Regions:
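Conserved alpha/beta core of the MobA/IspD/sugar-nucleotide pyrophosphorylase nucleotidyltransferase superfamily
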Residues: 67, 144-230
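Conserved core of the sugar-phosphate nucleotidyltransferase
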Residues: 81-178
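N-terminal glycine-rich phosphate-binding loop and ensuing alpha1 helix
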Residues: 1-28
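Short phosphate-binding loop-to-helix
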Residues: 25, 31-90
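Hydrophobic/aromatic residues located in beta-strands of well-ordered beta-sheets
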Residues: 24-26, 99, 127, 198
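A conserved hydrophobic position in a structured secondary element of the catalytic/binding core
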Residues: 28-29, 80, 164, 211
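Short, high-confidence coil segments that cap the C-terminus of an alpha-helix
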Residues: 21, 67, 94-98, 196
Length: 230
């Protein structure tokens, strides 16, 4: 609970506020989650509880919803912005089958944190690799990574916001779990391992992914400052 409300409701209300024209659905695997959302008028699709990843769950849910293009905001991203959603849609305006967002790291502590996923991209803005480890890693600097080095180099945090074509979702759920995905516990690596591309946009919008109790405290502070509510 954050501010007396479940995090899921913060995310739901935020999306409705910043993207009111979206056909908004929630993929859930527990009637308690459905019942949490229903009083606010949010629609849910019940899915199996044994999916390997959130993307597998989205693939099942979209077989009910039937969207050609799916924007997936994970339930730990309560500060998603309208600009981020527009950026995702822009990335999907071309031939891309999947897209996601990243933002610059500001501190060495966050860059080292395994709960904050890193992404390295090629010159065309396509993901090369995602990792919980600090990447790129400065060989000649070793453990001497500081805030100044992080700010001066291409150190990007992956955000839990995706866009997919429906056909990519169908193909994703049919793929076996990849070896890298199993090691890092990062579902997007299944796409990389299969030889497919992920377009990555870099957002400057401030955001806090809530993955730990410390993140929840940071989000509560942002809400008190007026920067995190819907």
């Amino acid at each position: 609970m954050i501010g007396g409300r479940p995090l899921l409701l913060w995310v739901a209300e935020r999306i409705r506020s910043v993207a009111p024209d979206l056909d908004l659905w929630f993929a859930v695997d527990d009637p308690l989650l459905r019942d949490c959302l229903a009083p606010g008028g949010f629609r849910s699709v019940m899915t199996r509880a044994d999916h390997e990843s959130g993307t597998d769950r989205i693939a099942e849910a979209n077989r009910t919803v039937g969207a050609d293009l799916v924007i997936n905001v994970q339930a730990d991203e309560p500060m998603v912005t309208s600009g981020q959603i527009r950026m995702l849609c822009g990335l999907m305006a071309g031939p891309a089958e999947m897209a996601t967002l990243a933002s610059r790291f500001r501190t060495a502590g966050d860059f080292r944190n395994p709960n904050q996923v890193k992404v390295v991209c090629d010159g065309a803005g396509r993901a090369v690799y995602f990792s919980r480890a600090p990447i790129p890693y400065p060989r000649d600097r070793g453990e001497g990574i500081d805030d100044a080095w992080v700010a001066a180099n291409p150190c990007y945090r992956h955000l839990g916001i995706y866009a997919y074509r429906a056909r990519l979702l169908d193909e994703f759920s049919a793929l076996p779990k990849g070896r890298l995905e199993a090691i890092e516990h990062l579902e997007q690596l299944r796409v990389i391992e299969s030889g497919r591309e992920i377009a990555v946009g870099v957002t400057e919008d401030p955001t806090i992914g809530v993955d730990t109790p410390e993140d929840a405290i940071r989000f509560e502070e942002a809400v008190r400052r007026g920067g995190g509510g819907p």
